[in-house]
């Protein structure tokens, strides 16, 4: 049985479980699929085109290398695929998240075909996930007098990959969904017993809420009722995301309530919105930032106090809580990202300034922390190559400083990386 037939068998098996075809990361399988695409009479050609466009894992998988190189051959007219014209081939490359796609784009940008070079230039200006080897290729081309490379580096020095992105929405309408009462652990969102399925995002997504199908269906029903709003997952009277720092917890939340990162990348969602009466666990909040999401300290319950200002205790000696405002499932609220306030209609509920610091808003705008980290490095690199000062685009990081006290080696490294150094005068 060839690799494609095995894949079809796997698809049939997954369909019985209510799963879609697994994203392709095997280069050998994708090569077989490409052969079927180039064969105009192949009975599997239509499905093969759909698999190629919509169901290949991005990044540095062997399939991503095969996909990027085939797109390059389409652009160079070695193959004429009517369903994938040149413009669309460039668009697909732009969604592949670095690695082999960037290598192909640089090949085209510094190549001899000016039309292709200009198209590759426009795509590269929007990319941030470049390896050092990619940056060195642009540097070498620039020093050799390549104008396209110069244009790309000038764009990077201005951080246009960030400044040309749309600002985050000023007002975001959310509908609440209480995932649980009390602290919610990452194990509730991504059980450790299901660790074996984490690489299969769709399959792993089915374990959210510890496989509670009724709760999952309630969430789906809520989304269907409010298609124009974003679901905010809430830990009522508790903290969201306590326990281990597993990224799969946030990935599962994003898969269920986040937005699609790309129409050409299957089962990768970003920007989930989560809230907790007592806020978000710091480690979990970091992983929310990685996805460009929003974490909100709701403060919707407070300790009841007596006339002296002391907490009122129940029969068990625990503080009695009073509800400040309701976030019961189905409650529609508005997040004002400019005023940094949570509203119920016109009623101000809570100050959420901590959720919208300048740095956090950058993560949201860029689609996650990695894009900002890579972007800063790219801007610094380009400005040094061009021997120009990098304009202040990103919020300045805070340097570590302790009066009368030395710095640890880690603190010194942090401070050095926190600054975009200006050229020497």
Descriptions of predicted regions:
Residues 1-10, 99, 349-355:
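Short, 15-30-residue, compositionally biased linear elements
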Residues 2-39, 360-364, 369-373:
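Amphipathic alpha-helical packing elements
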Residues 7, 29, 85-86, 101-102, ...:
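N-terminal alpha-helical segment
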Residues 19-22, 46-61, 76, 83-97, ...:
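Structural detector for internal amphipathic alpha-helices that build alpha-solenoid repeat scaffolds
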Residues 27-34, 58-77, 98-110, 129-141:
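Amphipathic alpha-helical scaffolding segments comprising HEAT/armadillo-like alpha-solenoid repeats
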Residues 37-41, 74-81, 93-94, 108-113, ...:
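Alpha-solenoid helical repeat architecture
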Residues 95, 107-110, 114-425:
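Fe-S-dependent hydro-lyases/dehydratases of central metabolism
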């Amino acid at each position: 049985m060839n690799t494609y037939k095995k894949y079809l068998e796997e698809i049939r098996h997954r369909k019985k479980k209510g799963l879609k075809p697994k994203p392709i990361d095997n280069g050998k399988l994708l090569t077989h699929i490409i052969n079927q695409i180039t064969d105009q009479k192949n009975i599997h050609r239509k499905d093969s085109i759909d698999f190629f466009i919509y169901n290949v894992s991005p990044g540095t998988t062997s399939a991503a290398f095969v996909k990027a190189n085939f797109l390059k051959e389409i652009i160079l007219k070695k193959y004429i695929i009517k369903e994938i014209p040149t413009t669309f081939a460039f668009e697909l490359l732009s969604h592949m998240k670095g690695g082999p796609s960037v290598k192909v784009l640089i090949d085209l940008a510094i190549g001899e075909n000016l039309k292709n070079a200009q198209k590759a230039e426009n795509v590269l200006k929007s990319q941030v996930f470049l390896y050092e080897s990619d940056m060195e290729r642009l540097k070498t081309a620039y020093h050799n007098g390549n104008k396209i490379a110069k244009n790309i580096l000038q764009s990077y020095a201005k951080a246009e990959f960030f400044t040309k992105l749309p600002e985050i929405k000023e007002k975001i309408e959310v509908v609440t969904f209480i995932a649980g009462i009390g602290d919610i652990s990452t194990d509730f969102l991504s059980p450790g017993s299901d660790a074996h399925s984490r690489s299969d995002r769709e399959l792993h997504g089915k374990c959210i809420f510890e496989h509670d199908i009724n709760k999952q269906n309630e969430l789906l029903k809520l989304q269907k009722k409010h298609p124009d709003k974003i679901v905010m997952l809430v830990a009522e009277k508790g903290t969201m995301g306590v326990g281990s720092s597993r990224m799969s917890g946030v990935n599962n939340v994003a898969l269920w309530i986040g937005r699609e990162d790309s129409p050409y990348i299957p089962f990768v969602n970003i920007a989930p919105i989560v809230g907790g009466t007592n806020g978000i666990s710091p480690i979990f909040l970091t992983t929310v930032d990685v996805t460009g999401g929003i974490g909100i300290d709701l403060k919707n319950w407070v300790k009841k106090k007596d006339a002296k200002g002391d907490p009122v205790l129940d029969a068990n000696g625990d503080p009695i809580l009073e509800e400040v405002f309701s976030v019961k499932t189905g409650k529609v609220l508005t997040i004002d990202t400019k005023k940094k306030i949570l509203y119920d209609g016109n009623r101000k509920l809570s100050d959420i300034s901590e959720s919208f610091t300048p740095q956090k808003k950058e993560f949201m705008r860029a689609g996650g922390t990695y894009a900002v980290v890579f972007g800063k490095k790219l801007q610094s690199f380009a400005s040094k190559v061009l021997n120009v000062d990098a304009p202040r685009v990103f919020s300045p990081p805070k340097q570590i400083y302790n009066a009368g006290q030395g710095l640890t080696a880690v603190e010194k490294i942090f401070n050095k990386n926190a600054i975009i150094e200006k050229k020497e005068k």
